[in-house]
From Swiss-Prot:
Record's protein name: Probable vesicular-fusion protein sec17 homolog
Positions bearing Phosphoserine: 76
Origin: domain of life: Eukaryota
A GO MF label: soluble NSF attachment protein activity
Transmembrane segments: none
Bilayer topology term: Peripheral membrane protein
Subcellular location(s) of the protein: Membrane
Location (main, coarse): membrane
Family from the record: Belongs to the SNAP family.
Role of this protein: Required for vesicular transport between the endoplasmic reticulum and the Golgi apparatus.
GO biological process, one term: vacuole fusion, non-autophagic
Keywords assigned: ER-Golgi transport, Membrane, Phosphoprotein, Protein transport, Transport
InterPro entries: NSF_attach (IPR000744), TPR-like_helical_dom_sf (IPR011990)
């Protein structure tokens, strides 16, 4: 018969508060025993589908493990707390996952920390709608993957950061990340086909940033990154759009976007940035009238 997790929690709390670090007759360290009881309670709550209660019990178990300086087990237990909290209490899930990540980095386990930084970014982005925090998490993950020579994973994280930076209006950061991934991908036969998309996104960020001279220079710079970009529809679109921006012609801008979209469907990210650019053109038109 499975023990009542509530009773296990009470027993664990009493054990943790007991006097003395070790029992007199071979009982072991009180924090070790308390940790085991909290873990048993956590798994009991899981069986009962009580996610929040399980998360709290795992968190208490991790605290006991830290008291015995068992940082590796504590980090893994905080991850279990994160998994349990996530559905019902995403903010608590993010909090305990950050503790786990800090423990992993202190132990030099940056690959595992990067994996959980991606999870943390996803919580901030999807559940908590904290775009700035998500952006920072993805940036950290990319840097840690890169330091571990996991270039494909690093690029995936950098692209997540770039997308969010663009949507936040942090266009310079988005441009740096898109160009960084483009340069890293251009010599890889499996990844080279995606370079035109990264450069298109970087170009749109230049336009959204409102610096026409920088945009023209960027179009030349893109050909240095990938000379074959000159023959793509994406490059032609950027050139056409820049012409309409310099002419302050919102209708022509919309026509060029529509024509491109007929053959290459625009995703929601590009559509959002394009609408921002079009709005800027319309404001410029209004200023001229």
């Amino acid at each position: 018969m499975i023990a009542d997790p509530d009773q296990l929690m009470q027993k664990a709390a009493k054990k943790a508060q007991g006097t003395g670090g070790f029992a007199l007759f071979g009982g072991g360290n009180k924090y070790d025993e308390a940790s085991e009881l909290f873990l048993d309670a956590a798994n009991g709550y899981r069986l009962q589908k009580q996610g929040s209660a399980a998360g709290y019990a795992f968190e208490k178990a991790a605290e006991m493990q830290l008291k015995t300086d068992d940082k590796d087990d504590a980090a893994s237990t905080y991850v279990e707390a994160f998994k349990s909290y996530r559905r019902e209490k995403p903010s608590e899930a993010a909090r305990v996952l950050q503790i786990a990540i800090e423990l992993f980095t202190r132990r030099g386990n940056f690959r595992r920390a990067a994996n959980y930084k991606m999870d943390l970014g996803d919580i901030f982005e999807q559940e908590l709608q904290d775009t700035k925090a998500a952006l920072g998490a993805y940036e950290d993950a990319g840097e840690w993957y890169s330091s571990d020579q996991a270039d494909a994973l690093a690029n995936k994280a950098y692209l997540k950061a770039a997308d969010l930076a663009g949507l936040c209006g942090e266009y310079s950061l988005a441009i740096r990340k898109f160009e960084q991934v483009a340069r890293a991908s251009v010599q890889n036969n499996l990844l080279k086909w995606s370079v035109k998309d990264y450069l298109l996104k970087a170009g749109l960020c230049y336009m959204a940033n409102g610096d026409e001279i920088a945009t023209r220079r960027a179009l030349e710079h893109f050909l240095e990154i990938d000379p074959s970009f000159a023959s793509t529809r994406e490059y032609q679109l950027l050139k056409d759009l820049q012409d309409t921006i310099e002419a302050s012609d919102a209708n022509m801008f919309a026509d060029k976007v529509f024509t491109y979209d007929q053959l290459s469907k625009l995703d929601s990210w590009k559509t959002t940035i394009l609408l921002k650019i079009k709005s800027s053109i319309q404001e410029a038109e209004d200023d001229l009238t």
